[in-house]
């Protein structure tokens, strides 16, 4: 198809910035960016612009002047969070004791998905048993859920801000023989 693609994967903002700087030095034509964090991208985007490299954001927004990138193809993270909370409310549970597994703090996805749950906790009586970052990581999510299980704290909902963290949560539930799903001991 005439295109050559290079790829760098990291969930850490500093590593992403380093990779982006290398792509700029390599003289790529386009830089597609799904940033782990919303901050810290101004100098990279200016360098890309100065080098004539078009930047396209996808999956997540960043805190930068819109003139520094060509396009942004992103989800409405706040709406995603509200949709998840609305679904939880539709389950009509007698109580909501929630383990909240957050993504990378400060990312657009984390902020949007957390905001809706925080509002529900403040206005609808949702009890946040714990609210911790698992940084989009299944293993960290499993450790957090296992810690709550081991503590004996009562919970019946796990609100995970991405699929990998939900998988980690389910692994902890399975290990403890706790049923999960709609109509089970824990809704994930």
Model-predicted segments: where are they?
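A residue-level marker of the well-folded mature domains of exported/periplasmic proteins
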Residues: 1-188
């Amino acid at each position: 198809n005439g295109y050559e693609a290079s790829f760098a994967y990291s969930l850490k903002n500093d590593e992403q910035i380093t990779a982006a700087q290398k792509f700029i030095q390599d003289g790529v034509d386009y830089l597609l960016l799904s940033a782990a964090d919303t901050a810290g991208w101004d100098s990279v985007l200016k360098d890309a612009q100065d080098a004539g490299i078009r930047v396209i954001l996808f999956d997540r927004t960043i805190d930068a002047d819109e003139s520094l990138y060509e396009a942004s193809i992103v989800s409405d993270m706040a709406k995603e969070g509200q949709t998840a909370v609305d679904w939880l409310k539709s389950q009509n549970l007698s109580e909501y004791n929630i383990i909240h597994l957050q993504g990378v703090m400060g990312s657009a996805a984390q902020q949007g998905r957390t905001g809706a749950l925080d509002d529900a906790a403040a206005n609808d009586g949702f009890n946040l048993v714990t609210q911790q970052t698992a940084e989009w990581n299944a293993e960290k999510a499993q450790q957090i859920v296992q810690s709550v299980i081991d503590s004996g704290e009562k919970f019946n909902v796990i609100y995970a801000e991405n699929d990998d963290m939900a998988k980690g949560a389910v692994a902890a539930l399975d290990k403890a023989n706790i049923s999960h799903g709609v109509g089970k001991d824990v809704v994930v």
